[in-house]
Regions:
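Active-site-adjacent helix/loop segment of glycosyltransferases
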Residues: 112-116, 120-169
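Short, flexible, basic/aromatic active-site loop/helix in glycosyltransferases
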Residues: 40-80
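A short, conserved alpha-helix in the catalytic core of glycosyltransferases
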Residues: 3, 72-76, 81-100, 104-131
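Short, flexible active-site-adjacent loop segments at beta-strand->alpha-helix junctions, enriched
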Residues: 24-27, 36-39, 86, 111, ...
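Conserved donor NDP-sugar-binding/catalytic core segment of glycosyltransferases
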Residues: 2-37
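Short, hinge-like loop/turn segments at secondary-structure boundaries
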Residues: 36-42, 142-145
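Residues that scaffold the ATP/ADP-binding catalytic core of kinase and kinase-like folds
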Residues: 35, 46-49, 97-98, 117, ...
Length: 169
């Protein structure tokens, strides 16, 4: 995990069509985290955020598809739709072309929105040679205020990029 930036910069230098590179991530316990996502459906978010664990187990395959569990741990791909905001290595010219983050998002969905807008000017890549330790996350599990902020940003995201109730990418 020592040379994440060097690996990312080298990847961007040899792949000029990439607008954003997302790394391989582990939490503090060394467990893999899934930073790349497919376009979500409302149903997937409801199951992921609010369903009891028994129901989540029933939809385990659907959730794994959303979180792109099928990505290789050794081979980069430029077939990513959304990258987590915990680490985004972006080309400055591409970020400037879309005017950066949309200030209308607060705390949630700003990374989803940025990823989709960057995909309009380049590709989003998963680069497993870039390795990080991510100790954050789970901000959605912090009470009703966060649920309200999540819902507000979610409505903004889906109003902007399109509502999908059951079908995900």
């Amino acid at each position: 995990m020592d040379d994440c930036l060097s690996a990312g910069i080298a990847y961007l230098e040899t792949n000029e069509d990439i607008a954003l590179a997302s790394p391989y991530a582990e939490n503090a316990l060394g467990q893999k985290q899934y930073l790349c996502k497919r376009y979500p459906s409302i149903f997937t978010f409801l199951v992921r955020g609010f369903a009891p664990s028994a129901l989540r187990r029933i939809f385990r395959q659907r959730l794994a598809l959303f979180e792109m569990h099928d990505l290789s741990e050794s081979t980069p791909t430029d077939d990513v739709t959304i990258a987590s905001g915990c680490f985004m290595l972006c080309r400055t010219d591409k970020l400037n072309a879309i005017h950066g983050f949309d200030e209308n998002y607060f705390l949630y969905f700003e990374d989803f929105d940025l990823s989709l807008r960057l995909a309009g000017v380049g590709k989003i890549a998963y680069v497993p040679e870039m390795k990080i330790r991510h100790s954050g996350g789970n901000s959605a599990n912090k009470g009703w205020q966060h649920i309200k902020m999540f819902a507000r940003s979610g409505v903004r995201f889906f109003n902007t990029h399109g509502w999908r109730f059951f079908k995900q990418q």
